[in-house]
Amino acid sequence: MEYSHVVYALLAVALAIIFVLKGGKPSLKPTKYQALLEGYLRFVRNMLLENVGERGLKYVPLIAAIGLFVFFGNILGMVPGFEAPTANINTNLALALLVFFYYHFEGFRENGLAYLKHFMGPIPLMAPFFFVVEVISHIARPITLSLRLFANMKAGALLLLTLVSLVIKNPFTLVVSPVVLIFVIAIKFLAIFIQTYIFMILSVVYIAGAVAHEEH
């Protein structure tokens, strides 16, 4: 299906919402979903405190939502017959552009036109040069952010597909395939967590840089 990534992206959103609803449901006895959600939100909160400071706490919902979407999007690729929406460049680029426009919006909102000083560099005479370099650097951010996630998820999906195909075509590989398959799945899960973290931390770093106030 040409737009299958949209369907899987919506499914990832649905899974994230279900997780939040189950984890946020009041209960006298804390459930595993509550523990997971609270631990995750604490992790996001600490990430923002370390990189942005106290005023960064208002970004907890955004970063938490991004992390959940990327995580569940990645996880869908582990389900037989399913496709990870994050293995499609269009999904990742849309998410990266959301981060890109949002942190620039926050930069102007926090600093006004003084935000442009972030692009000028420390030497006034070199400001035009630094401005061009910074603009190119910022334009490259959503591209690299989306490509990194796409490449890792696509490569993992192709590797799993190749291993399954080998087992189907050659029954003799059944002797060693379980061990190899378990190893590959373990590596894939590790990659899922790492890539989710990278997308989140880079989003936080971009926001932190944008809302930082120029010292006078």
UniProtKB/Swiss-Prot annotation:
SUPFAM superfamilies in the record: F1F0 ATP synthase subunit A
Origin superkingdom: Bacteria
Membrane topology: Multi-pass membrane protein
Record-level Gene Ontology MF annotations: proton-transporting ATP synthase activity, rotational mechanism
PROSITE patterns documented for this protein: ATPASE_A (PS00449)
A GO biological process held by the record: proton motive force-driven plasma membrane ATP synthesis
Transmembrane segments: 1-21, 62-82, 88-108, 119-139, 149-169, 174-194, 196-216
Compartments (UniProt record): Cell inner membrane
UniProt keyword list: ATP synthesis, Cell inner membrane, Cell membrane, CF(0), Hydrogen ion transport, Ion transport, Membrane, Transmembrane, Transmembrane helix, Transport
Function: Key component of the proton channel; it plays a direct role in the translocation of protons across the membrane.
Quaternary structure and partners: F-type ATPases have 2 components, CF(1) - the catalytic core - and CF(0) - the membrane proton channel. CF(1) has five subunits: alpha(3), beta(3), gamma(1), delta(1), epsilon(1). CF(0) has three main subunits: a(1), b(2) and c(9-12). The alpha and beta chains form an alternating ring which encloses part of the gamma chain. CF(1) is attached to CF(0) by a central stalk formed by the gamma and epsilon chains, while a peripheral stalk is formed by the delta and b chains.
Record protein name field: ATP synthase subunit a
Organism: Aquifex aeolicus (strain VF5)
Lineage of origin: Bacteria, Pseudomonadati, Aquificota, Aquificia, Aquificales
